[in-house]
Every structure is written in C-alpha cells, then in structure tokens.
Design a protein with these regions (language model features):
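Bacterial N-terminal signal peptides that target proteins for export
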Residues: 2-18
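Boundary of Sec targeting at the N-terminus
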Residues: 30-31
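Long, hydrophobic/aromatic-enriched structural stretches that serve as scaffold segments
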Residues: 79, 83-107
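Membrane-embedded beta-strand positions in outer-membrane beta-barrel channels/transporters
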Residues: 80-82, 121-125, 167-169, 213-215, ...
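Short, charge-rich binding segments
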Residues: 85-88, 113-120, 127-135
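Surface-exposed loop and membrane-interface regions of Gram-negative outer-membrane beta-barrel proteins
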Residues: 97-125
C-alpha cells in the first residue's frame, strides 16, 4: 500500500489496516483501525461527555510481493510516517481521514533494485464497533486509499508509481485489567498499481490480498492510548503509534 502500494494500506494503511475508535458505551475495547492508530474506547458513555474527535500518529514498515504485467514479480519494502484525524458521530462509529509520507523502501526486480523516493498518501475510512460486551470486542473497518510516488533505478531517470487500494478488516480482542487489549486481526484488500518498467507502462497488484496477525493496545490514560501490531502472514507489516481523543 500505501507511497506506493504498501503505503496505501498503511493509512490504512492505513486506511488496510490500523485507530481512532476512542469511544464505547460501557466498556473500553481497544484495537487498531484501518488507519493504523490505537483504538481504545472510553468509560464515558453519556453523549455530552464522550469524545467526538480523535487524532493519532503512527509509523509502519511493510514487506510484500507484487505482480506486474508479463508475470514480472517484485519484492517490495516500505517505511512510512502517518497522521489521521477522526470524527466520532456516535459511540460506535468513526469517520476518518489520513495523510502520510512514505520515507523509503525499494522494489527488487530482475534488473535490479528500484529505490522509492518520498511521496504522499491519502485515505478515507470508516470504523464500526460491531460488538462489545465489556470484555470481548469486535471492530470492523473499511478504507479507500491513494498513493503517489516515484521510483529510481541507479543510473536511470525516476518514473511515476501510483496505487489505489480498498481494504476491509476485522479485529477480535479482549480487555485485560482495563489496560491491555490484545487482539487478532484479519484484513482483505485489493487495487491496481500503475508503474513504468523498462520503458513500458505496466499495471500490477499485490500477490497477497490478505493480512493475518495480532496486536496489542495499551491504555496510557483516560484519553491517550498506544498500540503495536505485527502481521506475519500475507502482506507482512509492523506498526506502532499513539492516539488521543478530545
């Protein structure tokens, strides 16, 4: 995705994944939404006192395999820094927007390593706390992302790289002592990549259209939360961040 394909998801990535669900009627469920920011709910359930806004920052590393026209495969790694702002119209619904910068990474192909130059990403997403009994919780998310970057092979001119991504995910977790929230996460995603390889325009997509992993949310204070998440299966990723409700 996520600023190429991996970065598109970071805002999920983002938006395919990790969040800003800093509300809950009675419990304090926590996870990571598609935007990637810690999602811990609050004890305050009255409409007049619960937070209606949240913001977060996160960092993320991803590693995956891409497949382009002509059965050309590429190994991709990316690093990114992300920021997100969310509006919480109800105690279970979060509407969010994110922006970020992919700071580095590469595409490794038969002709060598194509380095990514910094580029922007953007995303729009929605999170829904579908179930929460005060101990266990289920969070669902959907995010649409776009990313723009350039790649450069040593000795050659830089070329454009654009990606679109739609990611749908779910997290199931448990509240431990009202402080720790371990969870399992599954996401499915897809979308096109537009690039130029060896002088020709090509399109591609991820060889893996899923993520399976786990994470941990930590309640640092009434309004401040942090998270770390690892994805070993599918599109591999490691992310961490903090979220603040207000």
């Amino acid at each position: 995705m996520s600023a190429p394909r991996c970065a598109v998801r970071w805002l999920v990535a983002l938006l395919g994944g990790p969040a800003l669900l800093l509300v809950a009627p009675a419990a304090r469920a926590c996870g990571v939404s598609a935007s990637g920011v810690a999602s811990c709910s609050l004890a305050e359930h009255a409409e007049e006192v619960r937070p209606h806004w949240a913001t977060g920052v996160s960092a993320l590393y991803t590693s995956t395999e891409l497949r382009f026209d002509g059965s050309v495969d590429a190994d991709q790694t990316r690093y990114a820094a992300l920021a997100a702002l969310a509006y919480l119209p109800t105690a279970t619904l979060v509407l969010q927007a994110g922006v970020g910068v992919a700071l580095g990474g590469s595409l490794t192909l038969p002709d060598g390593k194509h380095e990514f130059l910094p580029g922007p990403t953007g995303s729009l997403g929605v999170d829904w706390r579908a179930w929460d009994d005060g101990r266990f919780f289920l969070l669902l998310s959907a995010v649409l992302s776009a990313s723009f970057a350039r790649t450069q092979l040593p000795g050659a001119e830089a070329v454009g790289y654009q990606a679109l991504d739609l990611r749908i995910g779910g997290q199931f977790g448990v509240d431990v002592a009202d402080v720790l929230r371990p969870y399992a996460v599954a996401r499915a995603f897809g979308g096109p990549i537009f690039w130029q390889y060896q002088g020709a325009d090509v399109s591609g997509t991820d060889a893996h259209h899923y993520q399976l992993g786990a994470g941990l949310g930590v309640r640092l204070s009434r309004l401040l939360n942090a998270f770390v998440e690892g994805i070993p299966l599918g599109e591999q990723a490691l992310s961490l961040g903090v979220g603040l409700a207000f």
